[in-house]
Amino acid sequence: MDERAVAEWLDGYARAWGSYDPDEIGALFSQDAVYAYNPFDEPVRGREAIVASWLEDRDEPGTYEARYQPVLVAGDQAVAHGYSRYFDTNGTVADEYDNLFVLRFDASGRCASYREWYMQRPGEDDPA
């Protein structure tokens, strides 16, 4: 993998999140992929289980946006950073998260291992 390939994968990840199309989601991951929503929970195992997990708890279209970019690419592994924003019904930012992904890819460019760390940014009313 190189930086461009990882950036394209991340763009596909954001598109799949927006569409919730099972084929788009599945195309991102290897058959035996592991997907950890956070580093401390048991990961979801297998492409079909990952797709089902995504489809279980959908965000409403237009209520969020995301942007991610590679920070480091070394062989079949990558680290990416970005943000996810969620909006109120009036369009203002309700919540914002910084995200860090640790990724490993197979020879076909599909993600074989996904582990995410996320941290909510403090809001204007939150103590810094």
Regions found by a protein language model. Name each.
Residues 42-52:
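Short beta-edge strand/loop motif at the mouth of beta-sheet-based domains
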Residues 14, 39, 70-72:
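Structured beta->alpha junctions
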Residues 1-31, 125-128:
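Short, low-complexity N-terminal intrinsically disordered segments enriched in polar/charged residues
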Residues 21, 33, 62-65:
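Secondary-structure boundary/capping signal
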Residues 33-35, 85-86:
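Short beta-strand segments in beta-sandwich/barrel cores
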Residues 2-5, 51-128:
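A beta-strand edge to alpha-helix "cap/lid" segment located at domain peripheries
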Residues 34-44, 57-59, 117:
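A short gly/proline-enriched turn/hairpin at secondary-structure junctions
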